[in-house]
Amino acid sequence: MKIIFATEPIKYPLTGIGRYSLELVKRLAVAREIEELKLFHGASFIDQIPQVENKSDTKASNHGRLSAFLRRQPLLIEAYRLLHPRRQAWALRDYKDYIYHGPNFYLPHRLERAVTTFHDISIFTCPEYHPKDRVRYMEKSLHESLDSAKLILTVSDFSRSEIIRLFNYPVERIATTKLACSSDYIPRSPAECLPVLQKYQLAWQGYALYIGTMEPRKNIRGLLQAYQLLPMETRMRYPLILSGYRGWEDDVLWQLVERGTREGWIRYLGYVPDEDLPYLYAAARTFVYPSFYEGFGLPILEAMSCGVPVVCSNVTSLPEVVGDAGLVADPNDVDAISAHILQSLQDDSWREIATARGLAQAKQFSWENCTTQTINAYKLL
């Protein structure tokens, strides 16, 4: 079995799709079933898996500004959408006996053995959670990928069911390959977490944590409204810590963040380096993730793996990931989210149960399983 794997998602800042691509390709590189693995980046082959450098938050801000600039160039975006897959196809013209895997939706034109990973299809089901330019670009590109793909991988049973429901694609050619998190995400002692806590001026189990892109789909505005319903004494004792690079703008959200920051119960850390995240999770009192829509929900799995209680939404893929380990609520029910957050902060009996259940639930997910499921799916071609 000979594979060409597209490495474009492996870049700073490393998103959930980037993490999936990195962890999967590392394991494919040593899998005995893979006779040869070639790495494809942009429109050319590369010799090594890209290195994700740790960079300052200034660089993350620059990334956000560059993305904003590109969104204002519709002709440039459309030209790229039309030309890039053709450039890729030309570079791949002599590799017809290879399976090509695009881990981030997109595929070159007219490949005979093409595999794509669809992480979610919120562009089609919830376009209001995305910038209009992204919707226009991805709707066209995803339909082209559907036309080209001989096999679709997806990351949850929920996402698979959505693809089956919305698209006329052979059911037997849609495979679920569930995600996992790094082995760095484990329970840790206060002493182990101390350097990171000191770096960010935080206290052991002295905060609630959100990790993820700061964008409307994540329902951060609802999270802030729910947190604001907690008694001020509780908010000051357990401030809400937000981490993640800025997605597309939401002026109301940032007004709420600034207000909470002035009042002392919110802190926005920006994009936190990968090496700090396991400690930031492990030292948290609770993890909160009331997202409107997820294809998987990797941060929930990371939190459970660290032994941290979870409060999340009861929609899309999140119940599939959290199982019976967390408190779940309708993402539109601010009162219920607030009540669950309060319980996760104060109810020690529930917290003990949630920690044990979360650790057990997290063990069901591993990158080894994801890799095995992926290779088994390749065999369908």
PLM features: residue spans?
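Carbohydrate transferase catalytic cores enriched for Leloir-type hexosyltransferases
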Residues: 1-381
